[in-house]
């Protein structure tokens, strides 16, 4: 139990608090509309659907307040960089911002469904009551407001039968129009956010996500017409519903039961979302300001396996290891921004990214940089690009541990390129405050060509550690997870050579996936009473495996070995 708490305790606590707030708001506002006399006659007209519509509306306000905060990248980076308010454990929660963003989005979808279905029943009953297709009591309540100097309870004033009457409400009432619009926006945003769409049609995901602007505008004005109505406080003093409701025919004729007066609830949603909307507006202004700063591409390198490297310079640009940036190339698309991990080290006088060509945008950038041509390209022909960032990630904490495991899958090795480069520079400069004592590096890749661009860095590190008589500092395992029979025969023939046939390194390439259980047990036995940071940039399936290994191989007590799992999310 203790090892589970070390890795997941704070995350579970945050989720439980969030779920608890949703339950509290739902129950509280359900009772607000289901018990007080203010809504006594509204309940007589609408039944339990009134409370079932308003309770999820309160939860929607709460979650729509939260949904923007996890995507305020500059705010999160500021919090992450403030050691005074963020310990390592708190920063790990900030690294799960996108996971929380998705959870909040699904909660919004759930409450939207409940809210919409309940209001569909409300509209049907209100329309039926106006066309005398309901019980006499509801009809009598709906007729209040037809005479001069009366305030109405039933917001439907036209006498049009269903389904035409319901459609009329949807296209003439502000709540109906905005409800349809924001629900459609939500459906498009959620359906375009699936993994398949994001990976294969990123542009669709990118553009539909910007429907959030329409969503929040519609949400802010959704309740402006105040169609949910209740009895006024002044009217309740003169007309007590529980004493008068059985004598509806005598209302206005006897002193203790005058005709009740009704008013609509003031809109509240804007009060919930105005703060986050302001923060997000500031976020976008900062991004716009950064995007206008000049970026110079100093070098473009074409690597094997459809990968290019961009080396750039920007005035005032400062970075930490493992951070990422957003890149826009107006020649390819004037609006799209794409995230890329920085592969350079803070000690270098430029910053770089490695881009794998996998979609329309990256293909366009590949051609814009002249990488599809054989001849050398002049620097002035390179496209202009905009850069936003850098932004913090889990990998920033790598120097907070004495022992770390770095696991990269495929192009997921990029953040660790930055880390390993920085380690190399620190050793060259004999950095006195380097806490890190041991690195276990794992790289899993399907294709042999993918290793080529990274091998030079590993060779430099290998040589440096030998010169410093510290070959034990870095232990790396390069795992080839895909090969055919001819390759296997070739590897076997050269197995006894001094250097690896694929990477040129002294450390031999391994074939197949690591036995993670053995790896964790071996590392744990070599470093007792140590907090070991486990950093992954790779697929969710591998993340689940490593997270379970961290939990199962950590000691339950405060002493002993503890594996702390961290995953890149951007």
From Swiss-Prot:
<keyword id="KW-0285">Flavoprotein</keyword>
<dbReference type="InterPro" id="IPR050369">
    <property type="entry name" value="RBOH/FRE"/>
</dbReference>
<dbReference type="Pfam" id="PF08030">
    <property type="entry name" value="NAD_binding_6"/>
</dbReference>
<feature type="binding site">
    <location>
        <position position="280"/>
    </location>
    <ligand>
        <name>heme b 1</name>
    </ligand>
</feature>
<dbReference type="Pfam" id="PF01794">
    <property type="entry name" value="Ferric_reduct"/>
</dbReference>
<keyword id="KW-0597">Phosphoprotein</keyword>
<dbReference type="GO" id="GO:0042554">
    <property type="term" value="P:superoxide anion generation"/>
</dbReference>
<feature type="glycosylation site" description="N-linked (GlcNAc...) asparagine">
    <location>
        <position position="132"/>
    </location>
</feature>
<feature type="glycosylation site" description="N-linked (GlcNAc...) asparagine">
    <location>
        <position position="149"/>
    </location>
</feature>
<feature type="binding site">
    <location>
        <position position="226"/>
    </location>
    <ligand>
        <name>heme b 2</name>
    </ligand>
</feature>
<feature type="cross-link" description="Glycyl lysine isopeptide (Lys-Gly) (interchain with G-Cter in ubiquitin)">
    <location>
        <position position="328"/>
    </location>
</feature>
<feature type="domain" description="Ferric oxidoreductase">
    <location>
        <begin position="54"/>
        <end position="286"/>
    </location>
</feature>
<feature type="topological domain" description="Extracellular">
    <location>
        <begin position="223"/>
        <end position="267"/>
    </location>
</feature>
<feature type="binding site">
    <location>
        <position position="513"/>
    </location>
    <ligand>
        <name>NADPH</name>
    </ligand>
</feature>
<feature type="binding site">
    <location>
        <position position="341"/>
    </location>
    <ligand>
        <name>FAD</name>
    </ligand>
</feature>
<dbReference type="GO" id="GO:0034702">
    <property type="term" value="C:monoatomic ion channel complex"/>
</dbReference>
<feature type="binding site" description="axial binding residue">
    <location>
        <position position="101"/>
    </location>
    <ligand>
        <name>heme b 1</name>
    </ligand>
</feature>
<keyword id="KW-0325">Glycoprotein</keyword>
<dbReference type="GO" id="GO:0045087">
    <property type="term" value="P:innate immune response"/>
</dbReference>
<dbReference type="InterPro" id="IPR000778">
    <property type="entry name" value="Cyt_b245_heavy_chain"/>
</dbReference>
<feature type="binding site">
    <location>
        <position position="354"/>
    </location>
    <ligand>
        <name>FAD</name>
    </ligand>
</feature>
<keyword id="KW-0832">Ubl conjugation</keyword>
<feature type="binding site">
    <location>
        <position position="481"/>
    </location>
    <ligand>
        <name>NADPH</name>
    </ligand>
</feature>
<dbReference type="GO" id="GO:0046982">
    <property type="term" value="F:protein heterodimerization activity"/>
</dbReference>
<keyword id="KW-1003">Cell membrane</keyword>
<feature type="binding site" description="axial binding residue">
    <location>
        <position position="209"/>
    </location>
    <ligand>
        <name>heme b 1</name>
    </ligand>
</feature>
<feature type="binding site">
    <location>
        <position position="199"/>
    </location>
    <ligand>
        <name>FAD</name>
    </ligand>
</feature>
<feature type="transmembrane region" description="Helical">
    <location>
        <begin position="204"/>
        <end position="222"/>
    </location>
</feature>
<dbReference type="GO" id="GO:0106292">
    <property type="term" value="F:superoxide-generating NADPH oxidase activity"/>
</dbReference>
<feature type="glycosylation site" description="N-linked (GlcNAc...) asparagine">
    <location>
        <position position="247"/>
    </location>
</feature>
<feature type="binding site" description="axial binding residue">
    <location>
        <position position="222"/>
    </location>
    <ligand>
        <name>heme b 2</name>
    </ligand>
</feature>
<keyword id="KW-0472">Membrane</keyword>
<dbReference type="GO" id="GO:0006954">
    <property type="term" value="P:inflammatory response"/>
</dbReference>
<dbReference type="GO" id="GO:0009055">
    <property type="term" value="F:electron transfer activity"/>
</dbReference>
<feature type="binding site">
    <location>
        <position position="338"/>
    </location>
    <ligand>
        <name>FAD</name>
    </ligand>
</feature>
<keyword id="KW-0479">Metal-binding</keyword>
<dbReference type="InterPro" id="IPR017927">
    <property type="entry name" value="FAD-bd_FR_type"/>
</dbReference>
<dbReference type="InterPro" id="IPR013121">
    <property type="entry name" value="Fe_red_NAD-bd_6"/>
</dbReference>
<feature type="topological domain" description="Cytoplasmic">
    <location>
        <begin position="73"/>
        <end position="95"/>
    </location>
</feature>
<dbReference type="GO" id="GO:0070402">
    <property type="term" value="F:NADPH binding"/>
</dbReference>
<dbReference type="GO" id="GO:0045121">
    <property type="term" value="C:membrane raft"/>
</dbReference>
<feature type="binding site">
    <location>
        <position position="411"/>
    </location>
    <ligand>
        <name>NADPH</name>
    </ligand>
</feature>
